[in-house]
Amino acid sequence: MAKTSMKAREVKRAQLVAKYAEKRAALKAIIVSPASSDEDRWDAVLKLQALPRDSSASRKRNRCNQTGRPHGFLRKFGLSRIKLREATMRGEVPGLRKASW
């Protein structure tokens, strides 16, 4: 189990990412655009740097919904490999079963 504070930190990051997503996208579009002047581009870079660090989507970490485990996370199910295996063995995941060949 991950610490409660770590789970809370990830929730806070997710909220910040959602809050600043449009602003970040607009600033990045200005930076990448060949039509924008050097002054506009530099101004956009400074504004982007002024945004909260945790508002960047790359800082968000996928975590297991049940345990908060950061490694072995499977996006399709939202669970870590361990919890997915346990749920599969109980028959809670439709269409998923233990492999045998």
Swiss-Prot record:
PROSITE patterns, per database record: RIBOSOMAL_S14 (PS00527)
GO BP terms: translation
Cellular component aspect of the GO annotation: cytoplasm; small ribosomal subunit
rRNA-binding among keywords: yes
MF annotations from Gene Ontology: rRNA binding; structural constituent of ribosome
Keyword rRNA-binding tagged: yes
Keywords carried by this UniProt record: Ribonucleoprotein, Ribosomal protein, RNA-binding, rRNA-binding
Subunit structure: Part of the 30S ribosomal subunit. Contacts proteins S3 and S10.
Function comment: Binds 16S rRNA, required for the assembly of 30S particles and may also be responsible for determining the conformation of the 16S rRNA at the A site.
PANTHER family membership: 30S RIBOSOMAL PROTEIN S14 (PTHR19836), SMALL RIBOSOMAL SUBUNIT PROTEIN US14M (PTHR19836:SF19)
HAMAP family named in the record: Ribosomal_uS14_1
Protein family per UniProt: Belongs to the universal ribosomal protein uS14 family.
Protein name: Small ribosomal subunit protein uS14
Taxonomic placement: Bacteria, Pseudomonadati, Pseudomonadota, Gammaproteobacteria, Alteromonadales
Gene: rpsN
